[in-house]
Amino acid sequence: MSDPAQVLRDFAPTKEFFVGIDSDGCVFDSMEIKHQECFAPMFIKHYALQATSKYAREVWTFVNLYSKTRGCNRFHAVIHALDLLRTHKEVQARGVKVPSFPALLDWVERESKLGNATLDAEVASGNEALVP
């Protein structure tokens, strides 16, 4: 399988500057469909929010597409969405227990490079609270 990043590593500059455009959600209107059809359903499934799926989808979409937090790191988005969902009156009325993850919040607050590699390293270092 070819390495898609190899094109950039092999790139030979012909000018003293480079203009790059992140097309995901900027050039192409692809963010809504990704969040509504993929990320929101996985958020609901992963955190067992089926009993409140309508509101979980609403909150996820708001956090990631329509609020001041649009474009935030995915770990921040999960925390924001769960926190907001926990305060939603319809969710509270249904008695749905929305999970909280203090270990994730702690890690997000102290880690400067939020990504899968640093999360894996944190788990490997013994932070069992982050193990799914």
Task: Please place each PLM-identified region on the residue numbering.
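Alpha-helical substrate-recognition element adjacent to the catalytic core
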Residues: 14, 26-132
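Non-catalytic pre-domain segments flanking phosphatase-related domains
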Residues: 1-21
